[in-house]
Every structure is written in structure tokens, then in C-alpha cells.
From Swiss-Prot:
One GO cellular component term: cytoplasm
Keywords: Cytoplasm, Methyltransferase, S-adenosyl-L-methionine, Transferase
Localization annotation: Cytoplasm
Protein name as annotated: Protein-L-isoaspartate O-methyltransferase
GO biological process: methylation; protein modification process; protein repair
PROSITE patterns: PCMT (PS01279)
One Pfam family linked to the record: PCMT
UniProt cross-references to HAMAP family, sorted A to Z: PIMT
Organism (species): Bordetella parapertussis (strain 12822 / ATCC BAA-587 / NCTC 13253)
EC number: 2.1.1.77
Residues forming the catalytic site: S107
Region entry Disordered, spans: 1-25
Organism lineage string: Bacteria, Pseudomonadati, Pseudomonadota, Betaproteobacteria, Burkholderiales
Primary gene name: pcm
Length: 259
């Protein structure tokens, strides 16, 4: 079912951004909340079936409108069950967000694929920033497509969790993981061809917009109670275009770092 989603109360546009509304659909429901620990490389017996389950997940993504073969292949390549607690491994390939501890979640597969496909459509970004690395899953998927991935996480416990997961999959040299304030971006590395933000603020931080390369794209959830994905493209030194996409539900975007 498709429905119109109004902009969230209190939302505002950064200078230079122009709105362009589109129809949206609800793609995420209530999020489960439970602590999570790093999963071992073999979560019970799931490893024996994970290839089959990943292929089923990819087929579902196709039916949900994901058509970029690079994204589908990347989703098929990364074992999502290794990024969640062993007790939740049997649910890893469901189209659901799952808790990873610290009141945070791993996004549902469709949302991960949708966000990556949006910033990669008709292009091949060379340098990408992920804001809100969480358990490291989305960074691992990005690393299958993008040559240079920078992922920033504000919560120390999740930073350590992501680092362990990326090391276990031998991706630590392909993803530069940073413990820091994602709202500030990484100005010393910018500009970025694409920025993927995995938490929702009332507005996109200006620091992130400024770190987009000319023609670069940023995708992020925006809003509080009512959220939707927004896709922003830098069109000039002080100008950005904006398009509203699907309605979603993400954890809040917060400033600062947490030890």
C-alpha cells in the first residue's frame, strides 16, 4: 500500500536545498530491543544454510524493486548472520531490523540495499562515508562495491563490535572505521562521492552536506515520529537538490561520542 507522508514536524531544510516530494511507503515497523554480542563465525548450524538463505534474501530484494546487480551481489556476499547475536541468527535474513545492543539496530536488508542503490545509481562512487556504522554490516556491504569506505560510529561499544566483525571477515583494511561524532563527518578525508546516514535527525547536518563532492549524493532518514528517506545531490558550491523517498523508521541521530 502506498500513501503520502508529510514532512515531520519541526523539520527544516539546510540552506540551498530545494524540496521535491514523492510517494512513499512504510518499510519498517516497530523495532525489537534486546542486547546483542558479537556473533562467532559459525552461529549454530546456520552457516551450513547461509548461502541458500542469502540467495533467498536477494530474490526477495529483487521483488521489492532492487535491480542494481552490484548491490544484489554485495548483499549476497556478506553473511548478515555474523553481525547479530547468535540468539537472533535464525532471523538474520528476514526483512527486519534487529537489535545489536546500546539501543541500536541493524537495518533491515531492504533498507540497506535501497540506500546503497540510491547513491550508486548510474555511477560508481570511489569514496563513501557511512555515518552510524553500528555493527559494521552496511560498511561490509559497501566494501564489496566501493574502493574506499570510511565508517564512523559514536558509541565505543558498537565501534568495537564493528571492528571485530570486519576483522573476522578480513575487511578491516578495506573499511576505515572511526570512533567519532558522525554529525561532523570526516573533514580531513572529504570530499565524498556518497554519504550514507544510518540514523534520523530533524535536518541533515550542514557539515555532511559540505563534505559531498560536486555531484555527490547523500541519503539519510529525516524526521522524528514520522521519518522518510531523503536523497540529496550536490549541484553547486552552495546548492543541493533534494528528493523524498520511502517512509522508514530509524534510531535518532545524536551528536557527540559515547565511551
Amino acid at each position: 500500500m502506498r500513501k503520502r507522508v508529510d514532512p515531520p514536524a519541526g523539520g527544516r531544510l539546510a540552506p540551498g536545498i530545494t524540496p521535491a516530494n514523492s510517494n512513499t511507503r512504510i518499510s519498517a515497523g516497530a523495532l525489537p530491543r534486546a542486547p546483542a554480542q558479537p556473533a562467532p563465525l559459525a552461529s549454530g548450524n546456520l552457516g551450513l544454510n547461509s548461502d541458500r538463505l542469502r540467495q533467498a534474501m536477494v530474490q526477495r530484494l529483487r521483488t521489492q524493486g532492487i535491480v542494481d546487480e552490484r548491490v544484489l551481489n554485495a548483499m549476497a556476499a556478506v553473511p548478515r548472520h555474523l553481525f547479530v547475536d547468535e540468539a537472533l541468527a535464525s532471523r538474520a535474513y528476514e526483512d527486519a531490523a534487529l537489535p545489536i545492543g546500546h539501543s541500536q539496530t541493524i537495518s533491515q536488508p531492504w533498507v540497506v540495499a535501497r540506500m546503497i542503490a540510491a547513491v550508486c545509481e548510474d555511477r560508481a562512487p570511489a569514496r563513501v562515508l557511512e555515518v552510524g556504522a553500528g555493527c559494521g554490516y552496511q560498511a561490509a556491504v559497501l566494501a564489496q562495491i566501493v574502493r574506499e569506505v570510511h565508517a564512523i560510529e559514536r558509541i565505543r561499544g558498537l565501534y568495537e563490535l564493528a571492528r571485530g566483525h570486519l576483522r573476522a571477515l578480513r575487511l578491516a583494511t578495506r573499511v576505515r572505521l572511526i570512533h567519532g561524532d558522525g554529525m561532523l563527518g570526516v573533514p580531513g578525508v572529504a570530499p565524498f562521492d556518497a554519504i550514507v546516514v544510518a540514523a534520523a535527525g530533524l535536518a541533515i547536518p550542514q557539515a555532511l552536506l559540505d563534505q559531498l563532492a560536486p555531484g555527490g549524493r547523500l541519503i539519510a532518514p529525516e524526521g522524528s515520529t514520522h521519518q522518510r528517506l531523503v536523497l540529496i545531490e550536490r549541484t553547486g558550491a552552495t546548492a543541493w537538490s533534494r528528493k523524498e523517498l520511502e517512509a522508514v523508521r530509524f534510531v535518532p541521530l545524536r551528536a557527540g561520542i559515547q565511551s
